[in-house]
Curated annotation (Swiss-Prot):
It comes from the Archaea. GO terms for biological process: F420-0 metabolic process. The gene is cofC. It is an enzyme of class 2 (transferase). Homodimer. Guanylyltransferase that catalyzes the activation of (2S)-2-phospholactate (2-PL) as (2S)-lactyl-2-diphospho-5'-guanosine, via the condensation of 2-PL with GTP. It is involved in the biosynthesis of coenzyme F420, a hydride carrier cofactor. Keywords: GTP-binding, Nucleotide-binding, Nucleotidyltransferase, Transferase. It catalyses: (2S)-2-phospholactate + GTP + H(+) = (2S)-lactyl-2-diphospho-5'-guanosine + diphosphate. One of its GO terms (molecular function) is GTP binding. Belongs to the CofC family. This is 2-phospho-L-lactate guanylyltransferase. Its EC number is 2.7.7.68. It comes from Methanocorpusculum labreanum (strain ATCC 43576 / DSM 4855 / Z). Pathway: Cofactor biosynthesis; coenzyme F420 biosynthesis.
Amino acid sequence: MYFHALIPFKPVNPKTRLSSVLSQEEREEFARIMLEDVILAVRRTGCSATLLCTSKYECRDALVAIRKEGLNEAINWALPQFHCPALIIMSDLPMVTPGSLQRVISTKADMAIVPGLGGGTNVIFVKKPEKFHVEYYGFSFRRHLQIAEELELTVEIIDSMRMSTDVDEPADLVELMIHGHGNAREWLYEHGFSLSVEDGRVKVHRDGKEVV
C-alpha cells in the first residue's frame, strides 16, 4: 500500500533531556542521524515523506514544510491535504525498520497506532487522514483511541519494541545500542559511547565514564 509519511522534526536545540551526555551541537547532529534512519525505513517501503520542521532545514530525501506552530497544530494542518493514507511517525525512532512499518500499514483496520513507552503515541497510520486529528502530549495514546472511537474508526494497536522505544533520555541509549542497526547506533559508538555489564545490569559509558 502506498502512503505518505509525516515526520515532525525540530532541527535547533532538540533532545534537551540528553543535555547531560551530549552538547547542543552533538544533540543536533544525533537528531539528524536518527531522522535519517527513520526516513530510510520509510523510503525502503517505496513511499515518500514530508518533514514538519520548526525552522529552516534542508533534506534531499524528503519534502520539508516549515511550521512554527505547535506539534498538534502542524500535523492537523497537514492531514486534510492528504490524498492517500498517512503515516505519522516521530523522528526519534531510529530502530524502526521497513518490516516493522509494513506491519503497521498492512492493517485491516481503518487505522493503526503504535503506543510509546509511558503512554505517548509514536506512530499513527490512518487510511483516511482527512477524517482524523491528533492530540499529542500527555497520555496521548488513550486520547487517540478515544478520538478514533468518536469518529467510528476501527483501530489496530501494534505492539512493537522497535517503534515504541523513542530516544529522549540517556537511559534510552541502552536499547538503541543493544537493538539498533542503523546510523544512529553507529554514531554513538563513533562518539565514544560503549556498553558494559555491572552487577547484572547494562550500563552506558562515554570515554570510560558512566553516563547511565
